[in-house]
Amino acid sequence: EEVIQRLRSSFIHCEKLQTHVKLLLKKGSMYKIYNGNLLFHGCIPMRKDGSFAKVNIYGREYSGKALFDILDAYVRKAFFSGDEAEREKGRDIMWYIWTAPYSPLYGRRKMATFERYFLEEEELKTEKKNYYYDYINKPETADMILREFGLHDNINHIINGHVPVHRLRGE
């Protein structure tokens, strides 16, 4: 508990870090539509059948664009809400975004950091990707995602950040 409190205090009282976070929250978002292009980091959480995964956030289900919007709203609440309960929900959502199976930013079924550092069994170190990565190269999936974000023209593009390419595995 002491370590967590020290880390929390360091984060809260680091002026440079707070300046960077405020800039990210002022200028950034979970996604951006610019010049007819949809930009996002990570994935659009999907099910095995290629449909958008529904995620329960505080008793309501969200998917696709609505999921991005609600997560973005809660991240901002974590920093700016005057209501302590909403700030706490926002902080919980930030943890969710970092580690959860249906997080658009994480995009994996589990986080295996501990396993990679401390265990020898390779099968335990695997972080299986969200089904999004199985479908994203299909034109019908790209069209479905673009429509979800209100982009309907043939000139629209998805610019997807952080899609690792594993050359040694033949990608």
PLM region spans:
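Feature recognizes metal-dependent phosphohydrolase scaffolds
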Residues: 1-171
